[in-house]
Swiss-Prot record:
Any further remark recorded for this protein: Bacitracin is thought to be involved in the inhibition of peptidoglycan synthesis by sequestering undecaprenyl diphosphate, thereby reducing the pool of lipid carrier available.
Subcellular location per the Swiss-Prot or TrEMBL entry: Cell inner membrane
Keywords: Antibiotic resistance, Cell inner membrane, Cell membrane, Cell shape, Cell wall biogenesis/degradation, Hydrolase, Membrane, Peptidoglycan synthesis, Transmembrane, Transmembrane helix
Topological category with respect to the lipid bilayer: Multi-pass membrane protein
Name used for this protein in its record: Undecaprenyl-diphosphatase
Entry-linked HAMAP family: Undec_diphosphatase
Transmembrane segments: 39-59, 87-107, 111-131, 149-169, 189-209, 218-238, 244-264
An annotated Gene Ontology molecular function: undecaprenyl-diphosphatase activity
Disulfide bond residue pairs: none
Amino acid sequence: MSHFEAFMLALIQGLTEFLPVSSSAHLILPSEILGWPDQGLAFDVAVHVGTLAAVILYFRKEVVTLLSAWITSIFKGKHTAESKLTWMIALATIPACIFGLFMKDFIELYLRSAWVIATTTIIFAILLWWVDKHSEHKFDEYQTGWKRALFIGLAQAAAIIPGTSRSGATMTAALYLGFTREAAARFSFLMSIPIIVLAGSYLGLKLVTSGVPIDFSALSIGIAVSFISAYACIHAFLKLVTRVGMMPFVIYRLVLGFGLIAFLLSK
């Protein structure tokens, strides 16, 4: 992988990881259109590190508060809105772990194709448009009960299917349940922390045991670029989503999905 390819792939990952637009749909384009090689396991780990660092740094105050409240609830039995939210985030993480553990090989074998990605990109664009239009937009993330957390967690599990978008699926589910746009985004971003930690740890373990040679210069680019772009993306999205809503992302997904189908039909 050249340094330019590393830069572009990390930029794509950072910009799309937290937007409801599907990072897998974007990452397949360089390989399909430009013939770029697969980025490899080590680079996957690098961009996970970069995006994880970005979301933790951006929400550093919330993360410290939530973890402190969670630990206090365990050892002192003192339950607060913050400790409850932390438990709900943990609950919402479970379905994706189970689904990923048992369905990963099937998905990699049968569903990781450009046609599937194009189709799911379009389907979830329509779902996002519908729920954003009809949502009551009245709840914040601290009003998340176990039923809501589990429902959003199931949406996150479904996002293992390529093209769905983890953030897109979780925001869609949260909006359907009546969350405000900002609360849906914030809960989705906070939910990403444990799932990125688990996915990154799994990939890191595979990397250590694989003996694959590591290009540290490409990895450094991957970490730095994905971190900067993801941090900027989170900041911009939270500033804009309450004003512009989800429609720009719906339109973008539709254009991307149909554009990918047109490209595949032309081959």
